[in-house]
Amino acid sequence: MKTENEMNSSGQKNPATGNGTRKPNFRHKNYRYKAQPKKEGTKNSTEKPAKNPNHRPQLRSQAKPVIKRPRKNTNGSKLKIIPLGGLEQIGMNITAFEYEDSIVVVDCGLSFPEDDMLGIDLVIPDVTYLKENISKVKGFVITHGHEDHIGALPYVLKEVNAPIYSTKLTLALISNKLKEHNLTKTTKLKEVKHGQVINLGDFAIEFIKTNHSIQDASALAIYSPVGIVVHTGDFKVDYTPVFGDAIDLQRFAEIGRKGVLAVMCDSTNAERPGFTMSERTVGHVFDNLFNEYKTARIIIATFASNVDRVQQIINTAYRFGRKVAVEGRSMVNVITTAAELGYLRIPDQTLIEIDQVKNYPDEKVVLITTGSQGESMAALS
C-alpha cells in the first residue's frame, strides 16, 4: 500500500507542491494568517495545559461504537476487493470493495509519472470499472489527506460522483481541491469522527484513530456480510503525538478478537529494521539546531501536510524570539486550513509575510518552505 511521510523514505516526489503553480500572494485574503486572540488567564497558546497527576484518563475504546451489522450472507455471494492503484507502487492509492449491489471506494490518490512518461505531470487511476458500475458506488471513504490518497478526487469525481466521507482536516483539504475545480456544489462532503460508524449499502465502516505524518489519519474496519476487513491506511505507532491522541491499539485488539477476514496493511519500508521515532523527538532536534545557529538565518524544508512538524518549528521559533515566514503554495494552503480548524496554534505576531523577511536580521527569522525532496517546482528549488 502507501507511503509514510508523503513518500519521503522512497525518494519519490511530493505531489503536494504541484507543478507550474504561481507563487502565492500573502497579501491576498486567502493567504493571511490570523492568530486567535489569547484568552485572559490562559497560558501561551503553544503550550498544553498541565495535566492533573491524579486524573486517570478514560480510554476511548471503553465507549464502543454501535455498529449496524450488515445482513448475513445467505446466498453465497462473495466480497470483491479490487485494487485500482497503490499496490506494488508508491502513490495512486485506491481500492474498491464490492458486495452484490454495493461498492465502497477507499481513497483516491494520484502519483507522479515514470521517467519515460514525457509531458505527463500527474498520473491518476483508471476508474473504468467504477464508471461501468456507477449505480453501485455508494461513496468514497478517505483515510487521510495526503496527495497520494486524495489527489485524484477532482478528476475521478467528474466521472464517478459520489459522497465523500472522512475526518475534519482531511475533508477541509479535499474541499480546497474541489474549489479549484469548481466541484463544491456538486459533491457531498460528510464529516466522520474517530470511533464513528457509517452505513453504505451492504457495508458498515468504522473509523479508527491512527497516527501518521498528517493529522486526522484513520484506519477502517469494513464490516461486510461475509466478514470484517481491516484497512490500516498509512500509519505509525506514536505514543506521544504532538497533537491529539495516540493510535487506538485497543480498538484494533477488540476487532481482532471478533475475527477478521482480511487485513490490508501499510507496508512501506517494512523491510527496514527498527521503528519510526515519535514526532516529538524531531522537536528536540529543532531545539539543538536553533541553539547551534543562534546568529544565522534558518531555513527548514518539510512536507506541507506535516502540520505537527510545522507546529514544532513555530513553537521553537517563538521560544527563540524568531519570526516565521512561509513559502510554497501548498505550505501556505495547508497552514491556513489547519490554523482555521484549530489543528495549528500560532502565537500572535509570530508569522510574517515572505516579503517582510528583509526587514529582520538573520538571527530573528525562520523560513519554512516546500521542497524537502528537491522537487523541481517547489519553493526551495
Model-derived features with residue positions:
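His/Asp/Glu-rich metal-coordinating catalytic cores
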Residues: 54-141, 146-360, 372-381
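Intrinsically disordered, low-complexity RNA-associated tracts
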Residues: 1-75
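Short, surface-exposed beta-edge/turn micro-motifs
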Residues: 363-365
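Short beta-strand segments
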Residues: 368-369
